[in-house]
Amino acid sequence: MEYVIEMLNIRKAFPGIVANDNINLQVKKGEIHALLGENGAGKSTLMNVLFGLYQPERGEIRVRGEKVHINSPNKANDLGIGMVHQHFMLVDTFTVAENIILGKEPKKFGRIDRKRAGQEVQDISDRYGLQIHPEAKAADISVGMQQRAEILKTLYRGADILIFDEPTAVLTPHEIKELMQIMKNLVKEGKSIILITHKLKEIMEICDRVTVIRKGKGIKTLDVRDTNQDELASLMVGREVSFKTEKRAAQPGAEVLAIDGITVKDTRGIETVRDLSLSVKAGEIVGIAGVDGNGQSELIEAVTGLRKTDSGTITLNGKQIQNLTPRKITESGIGHIPQDRHKHGLVLDFPIGENILLQSYYKKPYSALGVLHKGEMYKKARSLITEYDVRTPDEYTHARALSGGNQQKAIIGREIDRNPDLLIAAQPTRGLDVGAIEFVHKKLIEQRDAGKAVLLLSFELEEIMNLSDRIAVIFEGRIIASVNPQETTEQELGLLMAGSTQKEAGKANG
């Protein structure tokens, strides 16, 4: 059997944690091989070893049967290995073509031969079905197009083995379909692909084999045709995982949040929320369903004080809170799990223990007379780290070093521990594995069952249908329908999200 990549007994450790513990990975020529594991299982670390970003303490790497020492990404490129990182590495002010050729520019008379560069980029683009605009600035193209540019960068450098690190985490459903077709085209052309992921549906749809990693150890390698999502999920987390969220019927109480006719503008001054009204009661989860870009983000920002409203009112337990400061709104009884945990949820270069106290550090017993009591802060942080199973070497580890799932658990613990009357959860499971998703869902339902009001924003229809007691459909900044998840389907919901009336959606669904 011809293996293009063999990683044998790879060990890589960081202070306080063994990320890869004698892992083996063998990739066949012309296959799409999934590397599956929870957030923090060691998948990206293993691939960073293969790409020369990390050096292992032990183990052997073979490329096309030959033992190699990969001490830098340049060495990996020379061996035909390319990596499409989860966080793209493009220069915003450069054109797509300039980004692709950066570092390997074709020269003519000592100067960059732009005509030849553009033609070479176009030729590769046409060959692999990666349609792009070479002269467009990287900052001006969609996330999906930026990813195509990253793929073309690896192909331009002659990669035969491509590593994709969580490639669908930031893509729309349509862009995900396009990416899967691109991967199929690459394999047809003789390329081999390693796909780092925790999305089981994608593995079943596109991969040939899968290697499961759990807590830094290689668990099993399987043919995808011989397994199923349930088996993969249990191998990944070490126990059975429920894909269906269990919850009893809601018992709504008094109105907690009342939004009445608000209008909100985005950063360009364009109205993105228009005369919108919505209510959330104690003891219920209200889900907001809509295609991204229809005013959801601005709505959440207005409720949490991150954006001004131009008209209308927002009341919490009968008191108006619109246009108050974020701290005053928080102290009035709102917890916020933000859509972008890095931008609005954490200070990445602070210890995770201090991040957990970001909403409370100025209160007793953590602060007195302007002096922080670090001992009390870290004592509280340790208890929440244990309660919410935040996997970290210790409470002093910087938030940046934690996996996405553990970062999210820390945020959820911080917000729920404050005992808010209204919990706003915006994209709470984005980028998380099935085990972490199950954990988040249980916590949201626990809040509902404790009599709290929960406002859920998600672009995952399955999540909205599973968790919500009521679904409010947003389109072009307005709530155009309110539906009972027990009485609708994903198809009908999708039509409503595209702007159909309830009557039209019902007919199409019928």
From Swiss-Prot:
Induction: Transcriptionally regulated by CodY. GO terms for molecular function: ATP binding; ATP hydrolysis activity. GO terms for cellular component: plasma membrane. InterPro entries: AAA+_ATPase (IPR003593), ABC_carbohydrate_import_ATPase (IPR050107), ABC_transporter-like_ATP-bd (IPR003439), ABC_transporter-like_CS (IPR017871), P-loop_NTPase (IPR027417). Residues 5-240, 257-501 form the ABC transporter domain. It is a peripheral membrane protein. It is found in: Cell membrane. It comes from the Bacteria. Keywords: ATP-binding, Cell membrane, Membrane, Nucleotide-binding, Repeat, Translocase, Transport. Its EC number is 7.6.2.-. ATP binds at residues 37-44. The keyword Membrane applies. Its main location: membrane. It holds the Pfam family ABC_tran. The keyword Ion transport does not apply. Part of an ABC transporter complex involved in the uptake of guanosine. Responsible for energy coupling to the transport system. May be a nucleoside transporter of broad specificity but with various affinities for different substrates. Belongs to the ABC transporter superfamily. The complex is composed of two ATP-binding proteins (NupO), two transmembrane proteins (NupP and NupQ) and a solute-binding protein (NupN). This is Guanosine import ATP-binding protein NupO. It comes from Bacillus subtilis (strain 168). The lineage of its organism: Bacteria, Bacillati, Bacillota, Bacilli, Bacillales. The gene is nupO.
